[in-house]
Amino acid sequence: MPKNLTEWIRGSSRILVFTGAGISTPSGIPAFRGAGGIWTTKKPVYYQDFMAMESARVEYWQYKLELWEEHGDARPNAIHEAIVHLEQSGRVAMVVTQNVDGLHRAAGTSEELLVEVHGTGSLVECQSCGHRELPEASFEVFKKEGKCPRCACGGYLKPATISFGQSLREDDLNRAFGAAESCDLVLALGSTLSVSPANSIPMIAARSGVPYVIINRDETDHDHLPQVTLRLFDNLEDVFPPAVAEALELAP
């Protein structure tokens, strides 16, 4: 049996990479959960309230504007790049991310191998007709008018992220579950594994006997499970990129 992360990566050919906010904190984007996470100090706006009340829509857009202005220029880091190197080696079955920051795409992860299970903040989406577009114009409208931007059809525009109380997209879940059923290694990176149903995706593979590796500095909801093969509490940026480079024998 492999003894360390490098050996697990080197011996696998269909890796399911499941990522959470911890992979983007080195890029300056704060985590939502865990110690000091956004949801420890801020109450989220639920989707039903967004659709029902203008005050909730304004609160939501104000929060998203603050995030956009503070973190909209964030760039991928060595963790995102290491995942791209894994893909280029032909070892990635799917990258399933809970993150909405778009950094996997920016790093070069292929669209066909990426599931943004909680949506993306890189686009806005009409809640009536489903039209999607880049968000800059909507942020300018909100800054100027102080109210929720509208689509040409009259529907409410909202960043294309999945809000609390909003259903995940069935196609995204199906792609993620399909990869979990066919992979030969699960890497859970930077996630507290506390949000359902997304946290069930790596467990589908683990319960079928696929090796399950978790790397996260904080505790996760899966730490106690017998299916966990390797658990590392190290900083991701310190251990994951070097392990990938060694497994793939990349030049420094």
Predicted regions and their residues:
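Conserved catalytic core of sirtuin-type NAD+-dependent deacylases
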Residues: 1-252
